[in-house]
């Protein structure tokens, strides 16, 4: 991607929004690599992570976050909201991602959180390619912008990589003149071990869809290099025996499909052959247990 911005700039940008507006898809598109998992299921992103987007003119350290939502019943929901709010600490700017043609209470919540942070906010109106009536876009932008201040407004399609060049140009203007914080080849601050767990979780959501129990997480129990081979052991945690049966599937076919597709994604991302083993285990009530959440890596 070619952008015009001089001199060299570098800074951090929080990517904020309600669930399922395409924050992770946008982060991946700007980075140029898959650092955040994506699915059609809301609240796919559960952890805060950095995506590092490097251009000739500068570097943007994108803080991808869980979607801000009103659900607070489980400890896991509260932890995810804390992670999203905490991502604003020390950033130079923020991106508010919304869906073209839609603004609801959770979008308002996200905007209020950003208003309290006192950083410049760029509004990114994503999924414009899905808007059936294109003439409705400008009135929608005017409606959303009324009474709200944005440093810039960008309609984009993160999935189709449309409108991103102008967005990058404006974001680089909002970060300070500085040397890059990360090397050119670095794309995330997260370890391969963490990414392996996320790729298994992504396949859980893709393969099970609406059948997937909400209280499902993945723990990487083993991650070891064996010559040119990566040996990875992944535990899928659920809360009840019935949920375990759903994940495993008849004769283990569903678990095999999940593991096979996750392994291919790992090999593509890590550039190495992967031997992946997966198990499903039960831990009752883990999603509402602060100690269990901490043990599973939730911030």
UniProtKB/Swiss-Prot annotation:
One of its GO terms (biological process) is ribosomal small subunit assembly. Residues 43-47 are annotated as: G2. Residues 200-284 form the KH type-2 domain. PROSITE patterns: G_ERA, KH_TYPE_2. Residues 156-158 are annotated as: G5. Keywords: Cell inner membrane, Cell membrane, Cytoplasm, GTP-binding, Membrane, Nucleotide-binding, Ribosome biogenesis, RNA-binding, rRNA-binding. NCBIfam families: era, PRK00089.1, small_GTP. This is GTPase Era. It comes from Xanthomonas oryzae pv. oryzae (strain KACC10331 / KXO85).
